[in-house]
Structures are given as structure tokens and as C-alpha cells.
Curated annotation (Swiss-Prot):
Transmembrane segments: none annotated. GO terms for biological process: thiamine diphosphate biosynthetic process. GO terms for molecular function: thiazole synthase activity. Its EC number is 2.8.1.10. Homotetramer. Forms heterodimers with either ThiH or ThiS. The keyword Magnesium does not apply. This is Thiazole synthase. It comes from Legionella pneumophila (strain Lens). Disulfide bonds: none annotated. The keyword Nuclease does not apply. GO terms for cellular component: cytoplasm.
Length: 262
């Protein structure tokens, strides 16, 4: 069990609800993932669902904690307004804060992000800020009152994995008491393992499951990957060595010679 913004959870995998081939694929993938937290966008929720069933009705059946996001916002004002709508609509003070500053790589706009985070925290929100792995930006968000940081592993939807493990490792070292969740760029279960081996608290992903040939099966793979990575970190992995070291201690006389000489 772990604590995320006051909620006790078993799963360290958070899953998005966009881009699935159908509502059935989404529901099965979320079920297989074991996640207890799903992200949802205001714009996506207000659109009609597939197969005659509204998206919102499908989401309610999942019985997960909702993490609404401010996807599509490009300045603090828009993000704050969207967050207020989400709080009223979904009855939650959680908000995944996204303020995009570039169309090419969907990188967050740092100045507007910090501004929005500060205002939303003052208004009683629990802010989950989508940010880069920039140490100074993350420090400013913490100074603004963020107890959670969600740095990217790589640009959204790229599937490139962790493009700067050193920066992420530095964040873990510098913010030991902050909840760190990788958000964006994860493409393979092995990427999720790597995240958790760095000591991160969780992984949030969407595209890697939604666009897989078999979303439900991929969700299962990510479920096990996150567990394996976390257990590896908790178990204490051996340090790398520059030279070989025998795993079996050697003695002067082979054991079968010792037996024959008895």
C-alpha cells in the first residue's frame, strides 16, 4: 500500500482513458492494469461514447479515483478555469495540471505552469503538475506548494522511454519526500521497470496501452512491470562492477576430489 494525496492505494500504475479503439477496450485494459486512478479530460468526457454508451457512464463502472486534467490549456487562466469546472463536475480537488507551451514536443510552459499551480493550491486543489525533468522548474513547483511532481520521461506519445535517466535520478535524490510519478513518454513495460528501479513512486501512461495491438494484454504487462520495478528497488539491487566476480567461491581442491580422499 502507498499514499497518494491522502488516498491509500495498492497499484502504483495510473492510466489514461484516451485513444482506445472502443469503450470496451478501455474498460478491459483498465481492469487488467489493476490501476485505481485514471485520468480524464473535460473535453473527452463531454463527447459521446462509442456503441451508444456515454463515456462518463463507462468510467463510473470502473470504480476508480478520477484525476481530471487540463489538457489543451496554454496559459494559467485557461488551466485554472478548467480545474474549477473539473472540481465541480467530478467532485474532486485533484487536478492534473497541464499547460502546454510548444506544439512540436508538447513541452509544458514553465512560467504559466508555476503561476497556475500556486493559484490552484491556494484554492484548495491537490495539484499533480505535468512538468519536464528540469531541476529548477521542479524546485519552483515544490516552492509553490506542490507535494507531487509528474516529470516526463520523454515527450507525450513518443514512446521513447527515459531520455534522461540522470536528470530523473537527480530529482529522486533532491526530493526524497515528494511523490514522483513519471508522466509521458513511456512506450514499453521495460520503461516502466526502469522508472520504478530509480525509486519513483508511480507511473502514469496512456498511449502505450491504448495504441497497443492488444490493449488489455499490454495493460497486464505494465501492471507486472511496475510491480517488478518497485520490488527491485525495495529489494536493493546489487551495484554494477567494472570487473567480473565469481558467484561461486572457489577452493583449492574440487569437492569430488575431497570426497574421494575421505
Amino acid at each position: 500500500m502507498w499514499n497518494l494525496a491522502g488516498k491509500k492505494l495498492s497499484s502504483r500504475l495510473l492510466l489514461g482513458t484516451a485513444c482506445y479503439p472502443s469503450l470496451e477496450h478501455m474498460q478491459q485494459a483498465i481492469h487488467n492494469s489493476g490501476t485505481e486512478v485514471i485520468t480524464i479530460s473535460i473535453k473527452r468526457q463531454t463527447s459521446a461514447g462509442l456503441d451508444g454508451e456515454s463515456f462518463w457512464q463507462a468510467v463510473k463502472k470502473l470504480d476508480c479515483h478520477l484525476l481530471p486534467n487540463t489538457a489543451g490549456c496554454r496559459n494559467a487562466e485557461a488551466a485554472i478555469n478548467t480545474a474549477e469546472i473539473a472540481r465541480e463536475l467530478f467532485n474532486t480537488h485533484w487536478i492534473k495540471l497541464e499547460v502546454i507551451g510548444d506544439d512540436y514536443n508538447l513541452q509544458p510552459e514553465p512560467f504559466e505552469l508555476i503561476k497556475a499551480a500556486r493559484i490552484l493550491i491556494d484554492r484548495g486543489f491537490e495539484v499533480f503538475p505535468y512538468c519536464t525533468d528540469d531541476l529548477v522548474l521542479c524546485q519552483k513547483l515544490v516552492d509553490a506548494g506542490c507535494k507531487i511532481l509528474m516529470p516526463w520521461g520523454a515527450p507525450i506519445g513518443s514512446g521513447k522511454g527515459l531520455i534522461n535517466p540522470y536528470a530523473l535520478e537527480t530529482l529522486r535524490y533532491r526530493f526524497p519526500d515528494i511523490t514522483l510519478i513519471i508522466d509521458a513518454g513511456i512506450g514499453k513495460p521495460s520503461h516502466a521497470v526502469q522508472v520504478m528501479e530509480l525509486g519513483f513512486d508511480g507511473v502514469l501512461l496512456n498511449t502505450a496501452v491504448a495504441l497497443a495491438n492488444h490493449p488489455a494484454l499490454m495493460a497486464t504487462a505494465f501492471r507486472h512491470a511496475v510491480i517488478a520495478g518497485h520490488q527491485a528497488f525495495t529489494g536493493g539491487m546489487m551495484s554494477e562492477r567494472n570487473v567480473a566476480h565469481p558467484s561461486t567461491p572457489l577452493i583449492d581442491t574440487p569437492f569430488w576430489h575431497q570426497v574421494n580422499n575421505l
